[in-house]
């Protein structure tokens, strides 16, 4: 059976969550939607809130999964994180947080985790 893009995305996001939990992170939330964008996963690493973007590319004709996180996507990611934090009377300026990327190739076995992606 052929999966829709949404189903495929959900599957890769779930695999990313399991991977990060095996690395010691704790799951907080998934698919938090705002007008400016969506937060795929929100995890916690000790006292740090981790906003996770999950990307997947079957091939690199249009660039890698990592390359697909352009400046515009990064701004949406930051804006959505700030809105999520605002729900808890916090902001990017005063919260201990970071932005990680989990990038997949064609399969869930082809995984790359980049902590602090936005600091690169």
Curated annotation (Swiss-Prot):
Q: Which GO terms describe its molecular function?
A: nucleic acid binding
InterPro entries to which the protein is assigned, alphabetical: Restrct_endonuc-II-like, tRNA_endonuc-like_dom_sf, UPF0102_YraN-like
Q: Name one Pfam family in it.
A: UPF0102
| PANTHER family hit by this protein | UPF0102 PROTEIN YRAN (PTHR34039:SF1)
Q: Which family does it belong to?
A: Belongs to the UPF0102 family.
State the protein's name. UPF0102 protein HS_0739
